[in-house]
From Swiss-Prot:
This is Phosphoribosyl-AMP cyclohydrolase. It comes from Bifidobacterium adolescentis (strain ATCC 15703 / DSM 20083 / NCTC 11814 / E194a). It holds the Pfam family PRA-CH. The keyword Secreted does not apply. PANTHER family: HISTIDINE BIOSYNTHESIS BIFUNCTIONAL PROTEIN, PHOSPHORIBOSYL-AMP CYCLOHYDROLASE. It is found in: Cytoplasm. NCBIfam families: PRK00051.1. The gene is hisI.
Length: 135
């Protein structure tokens, strides 16, 4: 869908809203991914209004759970996220937003919020011989 479908709206399109499965605070998790490299940059939360703003402005808006307010990524840091695509998962309880990220995505100054936390020890799984070649 293009932005023209949402111009001059003050509420989220009901056709989109009905597909969402919100948590008990009215939020949906949003995975933010760099559009060209597919690097996962961060996870934020959106309510219907943050989703509407994101769909209509071309910039990512989140709902801050700690500050209880809307924040548009990059307004204070300059590290803006320009929307390239917006998709719901099959259950409607998660969003994937592909963006063109300017600078760091993480509040720590790192490109990705997953750099700071680091890798955890994990047993690496392997496909069986029968599964090789399957997607």
């Amino acid at each position: 869908m293009t932005n023209e479908a949402y111009d001059n709206t003050t509420t989220l399109d009901p056709r989109i809203a009905q597909r969402l499965k919100h948590d008990d605070k009215g939020l949906v998790a949003a995975v933010i991914q760099q559009f060209d490299t597919k690097e996962v940059l961060m996870v934020g939360y959106m309510n219907d209004e943050a989703i509407r703003r994101t769909l209509t402005t071309g910039r990512v808006t989140f709902w801050s759970r700690s500050r209880q307010e809307y924040w548009r990524k990059g307004d204070t840091s300059g590290h803006a996220q320009y929307v390239k695509s917006f998709a719901l998962d099959c259950d409607g309880d998660a969003i994937l937003v592909e963006v063109d990220q300017v600078g760091a995505a993480c509040h720590t100054g790192k490109r990705s919020c997953f750099e700071e936390g680091g890798q955890l020890p994990v047993v690496v799984g392997h496909r069986t011989k029968e599964q090789e070649g399957q997607r």
